[in-house]
């Protein structure tokens, strides 16, 4: 029986990823201000999705802007093991809330790649859109639509304080031609699909 290589988390690589992401929207007091579907969020999504691609993950974006980065397993018909969080922040957010959940998932994939391991099930690292609800309400919008807590149509009615709809924000942040995610496959905005 062949032995399985030991997985080694590269804490410096994870830390460097966290610190690079924290630079986008960094405040002078050490926090981060990166509201959902803004220019800063677009830059953050571009950075993280670049790392996803570098790790060999295939990207899909649903209609509310959630990102699903998939590493196939030996049996792609099996349901994926999913992890992730969000990269938007509160107006005076920290460097780790949400970001760590996404980047820890990416680090797991990187470690599996480094060890040359193929999992039986696919792995998906998710970025949920507008989880903090600082720009659009309700909170947990992306994951809520995906999980069926409320409809896509309901979420698409959301407007920020300037009157911009979440649909316009998704088009700007996700589907802009200058955005590296513009070539992503689209996915339904529901776990049921």
Pin down the residues of each PLM region.
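Active-site-adjacent substrate-binding region
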Residues: 15, 23-27, 165-193
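Alpha-helical metal-binding/catalytic segments enriched in His/Glu/Asp
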Residues: 21, 83, 93-131
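Flexible loop/turn segments at secondary-structure boundaries
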Residues: 68, 132-135
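Acidic/His- and Gly-rich active-site-bordering loop/insert found
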Residues: 8-93
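Basic/polar N-terminal segments that are highly enriched at the extreme N-terminus
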Residues: 1-9
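Short acidic, glycine/serine/threonine-rich loops at helix termini
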Residues: 94-96, 134-141
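A glycine-rich helix N-cap at a beta->alpha junction
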Residues: 123-124, 138, 142-169
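Short coil/turn connectors at secondary-structure junctions
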Residues: 55, 76-81, 118-123, 188-191
């Amino acid at each position: 029986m062949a032995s399985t290589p030991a997985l080694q988390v590269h804490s410096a690589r994870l830390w460097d990823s966290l610190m690079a992401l924290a630079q986008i929207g960094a405040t002078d007091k050490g926090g981060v201000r990166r509201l959902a579907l803004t220019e800063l969020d677009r830059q953050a999504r571009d950075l993280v999705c670049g790392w996803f691609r570098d790790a060999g993950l295939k990207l899909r974006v649903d209609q509310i802007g959630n990102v699903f980065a998939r590493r196939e397993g030996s049996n792609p018909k099996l349901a994926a093991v999913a992890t992730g969080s969000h990269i938007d922040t509160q107006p005076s957010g920290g460097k780790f809330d949400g970001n760590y959940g996404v980047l820890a998932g990416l680090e797991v994939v990187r470690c599996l790649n480094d060890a040359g391991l193929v999992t039986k099930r696919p792995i998906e690292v998710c970025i949920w859109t507008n989880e903090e609800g600082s720009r659009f309400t309700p909170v947990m919008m992306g994951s809520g639509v995906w999980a069926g807590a409320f409809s896509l149509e309901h979420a698409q009615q959301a407007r920020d304080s300037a009157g911009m709809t979440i649909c316009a924000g998704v088009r700007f942040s996700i589907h802009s031609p200058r955005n590296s995610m513009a070539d992503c496959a689209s996915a339904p905005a529901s776990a049921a699909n």
